């Protein structure tokens, strides 16, 4: 079971770059699918959000081990796709996330910090 995730979020496409945005989006989904088939990641889920007045328009949640996802963040193709996306979509961000068994360790760290600071 995955203990970590990468939350990859994005906002609105740059005006005039919408078609390229879909092209890079398709490249990214194919890349994540390949990573899943190769066992590099456990899986991924894609969400397109309904209009809500905020900046976030969609995200991909990539699931895997903390170690594998740390390696993925510096993988040449991941960096290339993230760079391409940031040139055609506003507000691209990659954020680490605790999932599954990783939640226990994260909450433990938080609880320890609370006890040290109170």
Which residue stretches match the model-derived regions?
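Histidine-centered divalent-metal-coordination microenvironment in nucleic-acid enzymes
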Residues: 57-59
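Short S/T/G/P-rich N-terminal loop/turn motif that feeds into the first structured element of a domain
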Residues: 1-55, 64-74, 94-118
């Amino acid at each position: 079971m995955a203990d970590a995730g990468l939350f990859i979020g994005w906002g609105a496409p740059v005006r005039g770059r919408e078609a390229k945005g879909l092209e890079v989006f398709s490249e990214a989904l194919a890349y994540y699918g390949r990573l899943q088939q190769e066992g590099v990641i456990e899986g991924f889920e894609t969400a397109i959000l309904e209009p809500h007045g905020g900046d976030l328009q969609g995200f991909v949640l990539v699931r895997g081990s903390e170690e594998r996802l740390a390696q993925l963040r510096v993988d040449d193709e991941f960096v290339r796709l993230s760079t391409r996306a940031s040139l055609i979509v506003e507000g691209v961000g990659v954020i680490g996330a605790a999932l599954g068994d990783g939640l226990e360790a994260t909450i433990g760290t938080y609880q320890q910090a609370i006890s040290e600071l109170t």
